[in-house]
């Protein structure tokens, strides 16, 4: 089986699903089930068992095969992210943490300096750190060296639906990385997820494109199928582009060349 390996964990699905923006917890749960995702990210504020309306922890962990990846969304500094990660591990018991630090609410770009500092600390504390980062090959390599178990470069701005605007940088990160590269943010359609996988990404994380769809569970299923197809195409070996036409059948001796 062509499995996804992150740290000591193995997943058969290469689609990771976010849980924000859904119209209701019920719709979100149906989408998670339809997606077949095994790794799901949840904001710290959704770990609230005393407020059932805000609690996603209990219903998500009732789905067989689900592993939670808490995230530090809302943190604007490394110190805030580290504190949030420690609380999340205590509440969830999960070793995974998605380090997400975007101090400017206007564009939500991840802060590379604060992200690196937080990731370095958390990796030393035994977390399985998966940082959300700009599509920066140098930063990605530094985070790998700091002990992160994957890097999650953005395709484009969170919730923008602008697709793989960073494709050329993603290709460099994929080529140089020895840990999983997971495209996170900006994907609008299943075809973009398939393209990311064809490029050689190890997985994709999708949230808004599923959450705001007319039928989130069906869209989640479509993304799952696209991710699987893209991965299959990548492993099969995609043909190289050519600057000129290349005949599929030899054109010599067409119906014989005798006079």
Curated annotation (Swiss-Prot):
One GO BP annotation of this record: thiamine diphosphate biosynthetic process
Record-listed E.C. numbers: 2.8.1.10
SUPFAM superfamilies associated with the record: ThiG-like
Keywords: Cytoplasm, Schiff base, Thiamine biosynthesis, Transferase
GO cellular component, one term: cytoplasm
Catalyzed chemical reaction(s): [ThiS sulfur-carrier protein]-C-terminal-Gly-aminoethanethioate + 2-iminoacetate + 1-deoxy-D-xylulose 5-phosphate = [ThiS sulfur-carrier protein]-C-terminal Gly-Gly + 2-[(2R,5Z)-2-carboxy-4-methylthiazol-5(2H)-ylidene]ethyl phosphate + 2 H2O + H(+)
Function: Catalyzes the rearrangement of 1-deoxy-D-xylulose 5-phosphate (DXP) to produce the thiazole phosphate moiety of thiamine. Sulfur is provided by the thiocarboxylate moiety of the carrier protein ThiS. In vitro, sulfur can be provided by H(2)S.
Family of the protein in this entry: Belongs to the ThiG family.
Known partners and oligomeric status: Homotetramer. Forms heterodimers with either ThiH or ThiS.
Annotated protein name in UniProt: Thiazole synthase
Organism: Chlorobium limicola (strain DSM 245 / NBRC 103803 / 6330)
Lineage of origin: Bacteria, Pseudomonadati, Chlorobiota, Chlorobiia, Chlorobiales
């Amino acid at each position: 089986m062509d499995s996804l390996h992150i740290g000591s964990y193995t997943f058969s699905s290469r689609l990771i699903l976010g849980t924000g923006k859904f119209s209701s917890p019920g719709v979100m749960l149906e989408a998670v089930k339809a997606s077949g995702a095994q790794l799901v990210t949840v904001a710290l504020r959704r770990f609230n068992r005393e407020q059932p309306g805000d609690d996603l922890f209990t219903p998500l962990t009732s789905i067989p095969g689900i592993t939670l990846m808490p995230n530090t969304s809302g943190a604007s500094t490394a110190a805030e992210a580290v504190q949030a990660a420690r609380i999340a591990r205590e509440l969830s018991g999960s070793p995974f943490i998605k380090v997400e630090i975007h101090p400017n609410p206007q564009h939500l770009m991840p802060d590379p300096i604060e992200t690196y500092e937080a990731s370095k600390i958390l990796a030393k504390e035994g977390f399985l750190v998966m940082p959300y980062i700009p599509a920066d090959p140098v930063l990605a390599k530094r985070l790998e060296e700091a002990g992160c178990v994957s890097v999650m470069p953005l395709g484009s701005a969170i919730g923008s639906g602008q697709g793989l605007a960073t494709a050329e940088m993603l290709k460099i990160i994929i080529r140089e990385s020895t840990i999983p590269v997971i495209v996170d943010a900006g994907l609008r359609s299943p075809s973009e997820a398939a393209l990311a996988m064809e490029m050689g990404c190890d997985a994709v994380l999708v949230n808004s494109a599923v959450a705001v769809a007319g039928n989130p569970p069906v869209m989640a299923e479509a993304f799952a199928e696209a991710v699987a197809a893209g991965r299959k195409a990548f492993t099969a070996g995609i043909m190289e582009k050519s600057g000129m036409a290349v005949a599929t059948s030899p054109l010599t001796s067409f119906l014989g060349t005798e006079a």
